Amino acid sequence: MGQKVNPNGFRFGITRNHNAIWYADKNKFSINLLEDVKIHRFFEKLTREYQIGNTVIRRDRNNAITVLVYTAKLGSFLGASGENLKKIVEKLRKTLKNRKIVINVDAVDIQSPELNAKLMAELIAEKLEQRKSYRIAQKFAIRTALKNGATGVKTIVCGRLNGVEMARCEGYAEGEMKLHTLRQNVEYATAIAKTTYGILGVKVWVSLGEIKEKTDIDAIIRADKRR
């Protein structure tokens, strides 16, 4: 039986950049890795409040951390005169339990939140928690993404759908979705809906078209690094 590979990890270093960019010696690697996990979990909890689509962590040679937060609500994330951002950084320091660490948080505006797989998954999960139909929630997200320029969208919701005793999966797909073509610019994300009858899992794949030339791939990676 074939196993499905994560589309993001499948494309890291080819058409997508890694979510953590740093180098460390053996004795510091595990410490840095655990800090990265804490940072990702910290911003995961703020995803719905600030519409956070992705988090990228970078470290320099002095181990100073720069966190790039891609958000669709840039104004509310920064706050008046950057006050809210300062509070978020302070809470992040407390989470890491390391007051000496140098950490900066930079916010990047998401131009097309309708095409962001993470935000789509969270939108579907939010509607499921509001007891809306899982069919309507998925179809609405797919139609919205296709209207805004996606070439293909696939969604799956798994769990006790409509509260039935036996868990099952139901999904929809429209447009092209070449998951094993590395040139295909595919975003993948998951989300969890906590309902009264249990947890539902949401998976979303968004195809943004095929990258024809190597120069296009290099341009995407350079643009991501500049951001």
Curated annotation (Swiss-Prot):
Q: Which residues form the KH type-2 domain?
A: 39-109
Q: What biological process terms from GO does the record include?
A: translation
Name the CDD domains for this protein: KH-II_30S_S3
Pfam families according to UniProt: KH_2 (PF07650), Ribosomal_S3_C (PF00189)
The cross-references to PROSITE patterns, in alphabetical order and at most eight, read: KH_TYPE_2, RIBOSOMAL_S3
Tell me which UniProt keywords the record has, alphabetically. Answer: Ribonucleoprotein, Ribosomal protein, RNA-binding, rRNA-binding
Q: Name one GO cellular component term.
A: cytosolic small ribosomal subunit
The answer, when asked if Ribonucleoprotein is one of the entry's keywords, is yes
The cross-references to Gene3D superfamilies, in alphabetical order and at most eight, read: 3.30.300.20, Ribosomal protein S3, C-terminal domain
Write out the coiled-coil annotation as residue ranges.
Answer: none
Example of a GO MF term? rRNA binding
Q: What does this protein do?
A: Binds the lower part of the 30S subunit head. Binds mRNA in the 70S ribosome, positioning it for translation.
Q: PANTHER family this protein is in? A: 30S/40S RIBOSOMAL PROTEIN S3, SMALL RIBOSOMAL SUBUNIT PROTEIN US3C
Q: Partners and quaternary state? A: Part of the 30S ribosomal subunit. Forms a tight complex with proteins S10 and S14.
- Give the family, as the similarity comment puts it: Belongs to the universal ribosomal protein uS3 family.
HAMAP family reported in the protein's UniProt record: Ribosomal_uS3_B
NCBIfam families linked to this entry: rpsC_bact
Q: What is this protein called?
A: Small ribosomal subunit protein uS3
Annotated organism of origin: Mesomycoplasma hyopneumoniae (strain J / ATCC 25934 / NCTC 10110) (Mycoplasma hyopneumoniae)
